[in-house]
Amino acid sequence: MILAFSGCVDQSASDSTSEDATPKVLKIFHAGSLAVPFGEYETLYENEYTNVDVQRESAGSVACVRKITELNKTAEILASADYTLIPSMMMPDYADWYVMVAKNEIVIAYTENSQYYDEITSDNWYEIFQRDGVKYGFSSPNDDPCGYRSQMVVQLAEEAYGDSTIYDNLMLGNTNFEVNENADGTYCIVSPESIDVNEAKVFMRSKEVDLLGPLETGAYDYLFIYKSVANQHGLSYIELPEDINLGDYQNADEYAKASIFLTGQNKTIVAKPIVYGMTVPSNAEDYEEGVNFVKTVLEHPEVFENAGQPVISPAIAVGDVPEEISDLVVMG
């Protein structure tokens, strides 16, 4: 290892069935990996509440939160691919509660245009990545949880595969990331405010959904991506061992051996199982409509399941949860 330091609420709360009223706007800021299920939830909700216009903005989860906390934008729903962003970045000033609704894992996606696609396995992917001409992609750790989780997966791979050069060869040698080894044997990746990559080896974009088209057209070979997104887009992929893929609750202690420091945000994030979280921001223009949308999501977990994302059932809630959804969650 090279070390460097540096269902519906009462209609009084959701008066959305009046055909004569001006349509309400229900704004959603959500993680890019939630585009497919939230597209389905949008259709479901608008069909039930015909006077509501659901408007979604997809971005990296960190960017979604910062729209509210730094750019003074408002939304009725904030849905993050990393539930911990809500308590760490929004509470108590911008949120009072959140629910954990679904989970995921990191896989490596590819196409038939990918070099050595017929050779890559869960055991040799990091060796394939080091071959001449092979190019791999991930989203920006500064903008997107999928991006910093991809870094964590590669760091955790060193112990899992018994090779202390994996992160060095794949990341340190091709980016300006750094790594600190702590006294307790854990590792902290340092993501600089401005990330530079060796474009001959690495393909990086702000969020994971921006990487899909270029992968499919052969701009690069392999992509660290959520399993649900790979399924939704019909991509081939290899699964990674449970002790590094961030998809297994029972490996939480193992995952915690890796962390990342986001320099531009002065924030350290410790690796943990991938869990999606939702809240209604405190400054939502129509708070009750937001709560009603969350209620609809909780009442229709099949939408997540059909999108390849295992649900957490019942959903786990933290904080001052609205009474309208209290019967649909367990308190965490």
UniProtKB/Swiss-Prot annotation:
Signal peptide: none
GO biological process terms on file: molybdate ion transport
A GO MF term: molybdate ion binding
CDD domains according to UniProt: PBP2_ModA_WtpA
Matching Pfam families: SBP_bac_11
Similarity section: Belongs to the bacterial solute-binding protein 1 family. WtpA subfamily.
NCBIfam families the UniProt entry points to: PRK04168.1, tungstate_WtpA
Name the UniProt record assigns to this protein: Uncharacterized solute-binding protein MMP1652
Natural source organism: Methanococcus maripaludis (strain DSM 14266 / JCM 13030 / NBRC 101832 / S2 / LL)
Source taxonomy: Archaea, Methanobacteriati, Methanobacteriota, Methanomada group, Methanococci
